[in-house]
Design a protein with these regions (language model features):
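Short coil/turn connectors at secondary-structure junctions
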Residues: 1, 27-28, 83, 117, ...
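C-terminal lobe/tail of nucleotide-utilizing enzymes
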Residues: 167-261
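Walker A/P-loop phosphate-binding motif and the immediately C-terminal alpha-helix
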Residues: 2-44, 114
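Hydrophobic beta-strand segments of well-ordered beta-sheets in folded domains
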Residues: 3-4, 28-31, 85, 121, ...
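P-loop/Walker-type NTP enzyme "switch/lid" segment
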Residues: 32-113
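Structural motif
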Residues: 7-11, 34-37, 90-92, 124-127, ...
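Conserved catalytic-core segment of NTP-binding enzymes
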Residues: 109-111, 115-204, 211
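Helical mechanochemical/support elements of P-loop NTPase systems and associated helical scaffolds
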Residues: 103-106, 153-157, 235, 239-242
Length: 261
């Protein structure tokens, strides 16, 4: 199976909502790793609406010191009910970021072992280049996706990172982009030409539906019908179709990258 990492050059283009959306549409067991070191867990605060007291990434530092990192990981992940998704939640405060730097390299080895054993791993790496950034995960995933919007500011911020990620790519490691809101105003072809990277897929621009994944918001209501109608409309939405298509494209690209290593 595959280790797939999503990261942003700047701002908040929608990495977390996209990772969660892809995971919740994944056709087989998948582990989500919240590796964004910049603040408290966005997943616990957002998707799980302020859930507190759950173990997570920071608890693995002590396990690593004791030489039991691989054994400790299953004990600190949380399972999402009625899904095949489990989540390793991130840091609790920004002050923990420097301490995370020591865990990324050994955690990479554990995650690769998990992927080799048949479980996919999706990493939310947050913004590139910040203190405590999970550089080893970004550099050595089967597939790294640079997530950005399609406006000029996003392209300008992503340009140097696209060049750096391409230059650092090793055999078996693929780097592509994932565009949130293609055509606002630039096309996938424009993005690819500017950054010198292929565009894996585009995720629809739909902040209201993205909030369902990022913030645990209720699904948009329909004019007729109650929650069941809202569920059906959400499942049939162009946004969710784009999330599913992005996940399928990511699985194929990661598989191809692994075959080429």
């Amino acid at each position: 199976m595959a280790l797939i990492c999503l990261a942003a050059a700047a701002g908040s283009p929608g990495v977390t909502s996209t990772v969660l959306g892809m995971a919740l549409c994944w056709p087989r067991p998948v582990l989500v790793v919240e590796a964004d070191p910049t603040a408290g867990s966005a997943i616990l605060a957002g998707r799980f609406r302020g859930l507190q007291g759950h173990a997570g990434l920071i608890d693995l530092i002590a396990a690593h010191r004791s030489g039991v990192l691989a054994e400790a990981l299953p004990r600190v992940v949380m399972s999402v009910p009625d899904t095949q998704v489990s989540i390793l939640t991130g840091s609790r405060t920004h002050a923990q970021a420097p301490g995370l730097a020591r865990i990324w390299e050994p955690l990479l080895g554990v995650l690769k072992s998990i992927a080799s054993a048949g479980q996919d791993v999706l990493v939310d790496a947050g913004q590139l280049g910040v203190d405590g950034s999970p550089t080893p995960l970004v550099a050595e995933a089967d597939l790294t996706l640079l997530v950005l919007r399609s406006n000029l500011r996003a392209l300008a911020s992503a340009k140097s990172w696209a060049e750096a990620l391409s230059a650092d790519a090793v055999p078996g490691h693929e780097v592509q982009t994932l565009v949130i809101g293609e055509g606002r105003p630039y096309s996938a072809a424009d993005v690819s030409r500017t950054l010198g990277l292929p565009v894996l897929a585009g995720v629809g621009w739909d902040p209201r539906r993205a909030e369902v994944f990022a913030d645990g918001a209720d699904k948009p209501t329909t004019r007729w019908g109650g929650p069941t109608a809202a569920d059906r409309a959400f499942e049939a939405s162009g946004y969710l179709r784009s999330i599913r298509a992005a996940g399928e494209a990511a699985r194929k690209a990661a598989s191809s990258a692994g075959e080429g290593s």
